[in-house]
Amino acid sequence: MTDQPAKKVHSAPTLKVQLRSENAIAPTKGSAAAAGYDIYASQDCVIPGRGQGLVATDVSFTVPVGTYGRIAPRSGLAVKHGIQTGAGVVDRDYTGEVKIVLFNHSDRDYAVKRGDRVAQLVLERIVDDAEVVVVESLDESSRGEGGFGSTGN
């Protein structure tokens, strides 16, 4: 018998999902290569023109260790209807219902129907042990203090 190193078993990170009502729909990916998981509305609501609203999902989840969940807009809603998302960070220790803040930048009311995909959840890695150090000044960079489009002129 030879001494061979044990094979490493790679297990995929787990996104734990709790469906809190019969109207809840588990997040899904639109394709195998999609960056985010589609998040679904659990009930009908209306986002007023030039207003905002909170969309129920009746879903809670725990993101994998070392990540947080970023609630991101769906490009189709933005382009076709002027709908954007807001307040988009879900911490690993948050276990309540994830609700989606939608902003309507159009003049017309936008009707959300139960089962509509209203946002996407993107899992992003975090650095959770960075030490905060207060300094007198920062290292020089070629960009300097230029912001808000300064690199593209």
Curated annotation (Swiss-Prot):
Pathway annotation: Pyrimidine metabolism; dUMP biosynthesis; dUMP from dCTP (dUTP route): step 2/2
EC number: 3.6.1.23
Class of enzymatic activity (EC top level): hydrolase
Binding site for dUMP: 75, 88, 91, 94, 99, 143, 148-149
GO MF annotation list: dUTP diphosphatase activity; magnesium ion binding
Gene3D superfamilies: 2.70.40.10
UniProt catalytic activity: dUTP + H2O = dUMP + diphosphate + H(+)
Keyword Kinase: no
Cofactor: Mg(2+)
Subunit structure: Homotrimer.
Family membership noted in the UniProt record: Belongs to the dUTPase family.
Biological role: Involved in nucleotide metabolism via production of dUMP, the immediate precursor of thymidine nucleotides, and decreases the intracellular concentration of dUTP so that uracil cannot be incorporated into DNA.
Protein name: Deoxyuridine 5'-triphosphate nucleotidohydrolase
Organism for this UniProt entry: Eremothecium gossypii (strain ATCC 10895 / CBS 109.51 / FGSC 9923 / NRRL Y-1056)
